[in-house]
Amino acid sequence: MAHPHLDKVKEYLLDLQDRLCDGLAAEEGDTAFREDSWTREAGGGGRSRVIENGEVFEKGGVNFSHVFGERLPASASAARPELAGRSFHAVGVSWVLHPRNPHVPTAHGNVRFFIAEKEGAEPVWWFGGGFDLTPFYPVFEDVVHWHRVAQETCAPFGDDVYPRFKRWCDEYFTLHHRDETRGVGGLFFDDLNEWEFERCFAFQRAVGDAFLEAYVPIVRRRQATEYGERERDFQAFRRGRYVEFNLVWDRGTLFGLQSGGRTESILMSMPPLAQWQYCWTPEPGSPEARLADEFLTPREWLEEAEA
């Protein structure tokens, strides 16, 4: 069966992976991404690119995957019973950057496409994706820049798109067991098929193409900020919360593991170092306390910037 939609999306995603790696490697200097191609026995494969022990990025990865099969994993079909009995293709690029300097935020993003088919029925398809920022020592102007790029990305598709997907991002990237957000949000969307295919695909491309514009200026502004053991310890502590979200709440991690995806690539998003301290709380009024007090609850960043 021909997959004209799938072929177009896959071509874009492979190109996006190349451009993301080139743009991020340009900030790093001597350390390069190494590529690891893999195949999935049940159908499909991918191309993982990882950077480690860099001067800027302590660890980072940009992963392309295309998996397919004759039946969906339980994590997908349980919530969507109409998908039962359908073959599927899932294709996407996901990326995460864990900088060495605690003043440079961690960043994550992905764009993906899913299609499920069966004989005699219309295909079921949708897009998903977004990007989100996780600072440890946040700077208001950085957060505003991040959200302004997100808003400008969404604007051609309707005035309601940024507020809706910004709110969805705040809700999705929440550690419910901690009652805090993972970071300062950005954009998140899933099950996007409310427009015709070409418009949905154009939106996905806009989101993927906007990431470097949103992130690289922040990296450049904060990379030279001095830090010491205290800041690195706090970074490791907050990275522990990042791990908690990925293993407890993230649907993409669950889908990847249940669908027989490649474990090394799925867990590529994990930070290189993390730590947990029993009942630790930052000193009131400290820069560390400011993160939770001011930044880990949803805010209307752009409205505040214009006030």
UniProtKB/Swiss-Prot annotation:
EC class of the enzyme, as a word: oxidoreductase
Binding site for a divalent metal cation: 98, 108, 147, 177
Protein name: Oxygen-dependent coproporphyrinogen-III oxidase
Entry keyword set: Cytoplasm, Heme biosynthesis, Metal-binding, Oxidoreductase, Porphyrin biosynthesis
Marked site (Important for dimerization) residue numbers: 177
Protein source organism: Chromohalobacter salexigens (strain ATCC BAA-138 / DSM 3043 / CIP 106854 / NCIMB 13768 / 1H11)
GO molecular function, one term: coproporphyrinogen oxidase activity
Chain spans, region Important for dimerization: 242-277
Chief location bin: cytoplasm
Family as reported in the entry's similarity comment: Belongs to the aerobic coproporphyrinogen-III oxidase family.
